């Protein structure tokens, strides 16, 4: 019986350790699993630079992502930042359901490429008057995303906790991930403690 319990505890601990390592790895590293090798890098698009790749981990404030396809290229923006020219810093926050709107997709992709918003090609959703980026330097908030320009204020840079990692970019810490790791560590400790008590008795 002790041997069976020992084997059971060992298996549980191995699974918990693997989950711990997997969570940490997936949270901090871009990994391409979609068959687009060109996506596993930082991709320059005309004047704009996007972070491209696939991020695992389900970060609480960056869990949604947009993927743009242009020929064989795949561009991903994860509720983060991209750069237009060397001085302008732009931030977007998107809703996931917009990914199903192909016409809006194309309009927004055009904005990414040209760093300009073409209102005549913008579909009704989102409305150009309500939600189009304010290129004059202010901020425009609509039902679907938030745009802010650094030409009026640099405070918005702190709105989305981001930092670069391995040249690709990562989007802060996830409280849920930290809780999960703490729980895994606690379970590992408790199971080992019970194993020691069980063997000694």
Curated annotation (Swiss-Prot):
This is Putative uncharacterized transmembrane protein DDB_G0281897. GO terms for cellular component: membrane. The chain crosses the membrane at residues 179-199. Disulfide bonds: none annotated. Residues 200-201 are cytoplasmic. It is found in: Membrane. Its main location: membrane. Residues 122-157 are annotated as: Disordered. Residues 24-178 are extracellular. Glycans are attached at residues 114, 134. Residues 1-23 form the signal peptide. Residues 123-148 have a biased composition (Polar residues). It is a single-pass type I membrane protein. Keywords: Glycoprotein, Membrane, Signal, Transmembrane, Transmembrane helix.
């Amino acid at each position: 019986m002790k041997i069976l319990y020992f084997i059971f505890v060992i298996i549980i601990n191995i699974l918990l350790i693997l989950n711990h390592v997997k969570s940490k790895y997936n949270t901090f590293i871009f990994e391409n699993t979609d068959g687009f090798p060109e996506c596993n890098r930082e991709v320059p698009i005309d004047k704009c630079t996007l972070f491209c790749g696939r991020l695992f981990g389900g970060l609480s404030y960056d869990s949604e992502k947009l993927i743009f396809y242009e020929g064989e290229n795949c561009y991903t923006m994860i509720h983060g930042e991209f750069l237009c020219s060397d001085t302008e810093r732009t931030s977007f926050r998107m809703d996931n359901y917009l990914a199903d709107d192909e016409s809006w997709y194309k309009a927004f992709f055009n904005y990414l490429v040209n760093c300009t918003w073409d209102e005549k090609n913008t579909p009704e959703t989102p409305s150009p008057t309500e939600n189009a980026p304010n290129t004059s330097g202010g901020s425009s908030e609509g039902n679907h995303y938030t745009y802010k320009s650094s030409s009026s204020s640099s405070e918005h840079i702190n709105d989305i906790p981001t930092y670069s990692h391995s040249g690709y970019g990562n989007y802060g810490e996830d409280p849920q991930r930290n809780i999960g790791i703490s729980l895994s560590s606690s379970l590992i400790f408790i199971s080992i403690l019970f194993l020691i008590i069980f063997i000694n008795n």
